[in-house]
Amino acid sequence: MHPSRMALIRPPLFSSYRFGSLLMEPSSTPGPARNARRSNRRMRHPDKDVDKRVRELDAERDPLSLPEEIVSEVTRAGGRVGIPAKDQSPKQALNINDLQKLEHDELLALAETEGLQEIAALPRQELVFRLLKARMSANGLMYGEGTLEILPDGFGFLRSAQYHYLSCPDDIYVSPSQIRRFGLHTGSHVAGQIRPPKENERYFALLRIEAINHADPMQRQRQKPFDDLTPLHPRTRIVTEHDSQELSTRVVDLFTPIGFGQRGLIVSPPRAGKTMLMQSLARGVLNNYPDAYVVVLLIDERPEEVTDMEREIQSPQCEVISSTFDEPPARHIQVAQMVVEKAKRMVESGTDVVIFLDSITRLARAFNSDSDSATGKLLTGGLDAGAMQKPKSIFGSARKVEEGGSLTILATALVDTGSRMDDVIFEEFKGTGNLEIVLDQDLVARRVWPAIDLTRSGTRREEMLLDQEEHRRIETLRRDLAEHSPVDSMTELIKRMRKTQNNAEFLMSVHPQD
């Protein structure tokens, strides 16, 4: 083509432009130049949606995601998104979380009822996925919720606590524009309407956000971030006593009182009863504080211990999240970070959260094995110099905040395991907490339960949690028991406590010294 003709169809350059300014006025120039200008005008003529998109960009607003555009178009056309048909039965109206809570046998029976084929060999997650696709193809949109995990690429997925926050086929995709618009972070509990995956998609997609952390989505933007909240000393006591025959919680309430926002270590040798102690404390919190949210986080644990914990502690206000010893270290790290981030979002909303972590020693081992935390500098026992930074950050998240809400973490630390690394990990955490419950090997050998060393266990600033008269009587009791060995002290204490129905009655029998 001749250079002069090429110049005629070359679009003008602008540093700041509007699509409308690119339209050329009609010209009476005859010949090829006129045809070229007409062609150029056709090329630059915007379609009917271009002006709208430019106005959005000029206003510096995030563009709508594809799912949100679908909702917008349906609403503009006079339809309503996510409304089931009138003849839809209540059973068909189950949301994604209702299906995730069903047992495998119940899912199979439901799939057979709805006519699904070749389902006998499907794993549980795939069965839920097939059921959801079948229902959504018949009834349209459904409702879903989960805990958000934001990936490095900017998008995220809603994970389910039923699957211990593992990646599953029925996870719900959340677009980057939705994350930016509502200021979402990892750990946010998001609920809304979802749509099924298209032909070239693998996951369900979130269409419209209806709730964030069980509140209005716009309320999230008015909340202060967790790191900007003001930490305080624990002042509100957690009473775990709930059964007169459950002596472990009664002993803890007297000698190591726990407050909302406590950061405590349960120092335990092998087979000292730390798991049973955590179960008793968790049951006490759930029984006495129905508004508190309890999470039992089991890291590098045996599968049978996980099953036992799930059956012993059952409550709508409790989660048992685990990553067993056959999982890779990266999985331990991911589940721990998800649990702590979710707890932070709940604290921002004013909720009291209590996490029982078993164990922080194994979590530190996982970070030590993670290549992202490695610095190449080894300490005693083979511990990397940078491996403790993130576990300390997780443990240090526990606090009572002035704006309302609290995060309490009670973590077990393993000692006397024969591993030098475990001893170094315990020394790193020693002094970072404000509560220690020390379990004694001699008490375990004598079969004395609870195996708590009363002289080495205690709470910092316990006078802020106890009544003045109660504190005086406990101090007198401590002095009396300190004159004996740990075995004799606990044996005598158990004998006296079994004669009373509760701690208040027991303390009345203690005469304080002036």
UniProtKB/Swiss-Prot annotation:
Its EC number is 3.6.4.-. ATP binds at G259, F260, G261, Q262, R263, G264, R271, A272, G273, K274, T275, M276, R302. It comes from the Bacteria. Residues 141-216 form the Rho RNA-BD domain. Keywords: ATP-binding, Helicase, Hydrolase, Nucleotide-binding, RNA-binding, Transcription, Transcription regulation, Transcription termination. Residues 25-52 are annotated as: Disordered. The keyword Transferase does not apply. GO terms for molecular function: ATP binding; ATP hydrolysis activity; ATP-dependent activity, acting on RNA; helicase activity; RNA binding. Pfam families: ATP-synt_ab, Rho_RNA_bind. One of its GO terms (biological process) is DNA-templated transcription termination. InterPro entries: AAA+_ATPase, ATPase_F1/V1/A1_a/bsu_nucl-bd, CSD, NA-bd_OB-fold, P-loop_NTPase, Rho-like_N, Rho_factor_ATP-bd, Rho_N_sf. Belongs to the Rho family. Homohexamer. The homohexamer assembles into an open ring structure. Facilitates transcription termination by a mechanism that involves Rho binding to the nascent RNA, activation of Rho's RNA-dependent ATPase activity, and release of the mRNA from the DNA template. This is Transcription termination factor Rho. The lineage of its organism: Bacteria, Pseudomonadati, Planctomycetota, Planctomycetia, Pirellulales. The gene is rho.
